[in-house]
């Protein structure tokens, strides 16, 4: 389905984007190592800061390997879903598209409900029960039949040698007699079946409406989180730059610089995750209102 295709596609894009984040983080740590090494060489600080920075560089290398593995697994999963060779490389976006606006929940929600297969199945069951009641009622209604019957006889009344046809037209009226309440019990059973089918339709309608409203709420919340994490990302980037400048000036420790780098990296990860969640919430909402199924 298109819903599953969206999941595989955007997950592959997100994992690919996380590789760039890991690469950027490693580059940032590498720059810190160079700064610390220079300060050690001029004997401005001891080697402890350099050891701390080099350990973080190893951690950054490890994270980069992990993100590349995750990206490759996501790529293979996308290829498998698309039915292409594992060695093929499908073209994808370099980053998850950030959704900033959501599809409004219009007044046409009732149309969205009636387009769902669950609703149509429940409605068809009502029509089926109503047809069954009509068939059952027909057994107890008077039935009028008209027919023609004929025969040949020889000789005729005028003593001719040819066969003489004789026709008879008849009419028959069948009236069902009292059957010990069978008609009433049959109609009651039919009415009960129709009422149950109508209740099931109402339940299906309520369930679909709740699903649509919940999907729309999650979609809206996901958009808000994209905006929030985007704001945090901008602040975290600025904080890292300030921490590095203050470290060069000797005003903060290396731990504060590394923490600022980690906060920036986490802000990037959160931003990508929020963008991915928004795309998933969007496709969930579209499926709930049947947009995707209509395209299939």
PLM regions: where:
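Small/polar (Gly/Ser/Thr/Ala-rich) solvent-exposed segments
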Residues: 1, 16, 120, 127-130, ...
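Periplasmic alpha-helical coiled-coil/stalk elements that build and connect Gram-negative outer-membrane
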Residues: 1-111, 218, 222, 264, ...
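Amphipathic alpha-helical coiled-coil segments
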Residues: 3-20, 38, 74, 121-136, ...
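Membrane-embedded beta-strand positions in outer-membrane beta-barrel channels/transporters
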Residues: 9, 145, 170-172, 216
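Metallo-beta-lactamase
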Residues: 67, 117, 197, 274
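Residues on the lipid-exposed face of transmembrane beta-strands in outer-membrane beta-barrel proteins
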Residues: 78, 171-175, 274, 285
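Bacterial Sec-pathway N-terminal export signals of envelope proteins
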Residues: 86-88, 92-127, 177, 205, ...
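Hydrophobic, lipid-facing positions within transmembrane beta-strands of outer-membrane proteins
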Residues: 108, 167-173
């Amino acid at each position: 389905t298109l819903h599953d295709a969206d999941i595989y596609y955007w997950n592959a894009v997100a994992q690919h984007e996380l590789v760039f984040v890991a690469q950027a983080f490693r580059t940032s740590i590498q720059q810190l190592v160079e700064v610390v090494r220079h300060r050690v060489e001029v004997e401005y600080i001891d080697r402890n800061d350099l050891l701390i920075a080099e350990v973080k560089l190893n951690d950054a290398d490890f994270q980069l390997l992990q993100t590349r593995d995750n990206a490759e697994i996501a790529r293979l999963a996308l290829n498998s879903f698309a039915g292409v060779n594992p060695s093929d490389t499908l073209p994808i976006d370099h980053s998850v598209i950030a959704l900033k606006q959501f599809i409004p929940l219009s007044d046409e929600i009732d149309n969205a409900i009636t387009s769902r297969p669950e609703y149509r199945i429940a409605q068809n069951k009502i029509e089926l029960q109503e047809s069954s009641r009509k068939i059952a009622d027909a057994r107890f209604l008077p039935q009028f039949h008209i027919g023609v019957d004929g025969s040949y006889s020889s000789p005729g009344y005028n003593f001719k040698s040819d066969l003489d046809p004789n026709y008879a037209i008849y009419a028959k009226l069948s009236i069902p007699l009292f059957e010990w309440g069978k008609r009433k019990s049959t109609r009651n059973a039919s009415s009960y079946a129709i009422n149950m089918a109508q209740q099931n339709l109402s339940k299906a309608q309520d369930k679909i409406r709740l699903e649509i409203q919940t999907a729309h709420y999650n979609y809206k919340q996901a958009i808000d989180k994209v905006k929030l994490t985007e704001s945090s990302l901008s602040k975290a980037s600025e904080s890292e730059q300030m921490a590095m400048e203050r470290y060069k000036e000797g005003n903060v420790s290396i731990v504060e610089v590394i923490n600022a780098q980690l906060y920036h990296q986490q802000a990037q990860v959160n931003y990508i995750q929020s963008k991915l969640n928004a795309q998933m919430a969007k496709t969930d909402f579209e499926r709930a209102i049947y947009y995707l199924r209509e395209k299939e």
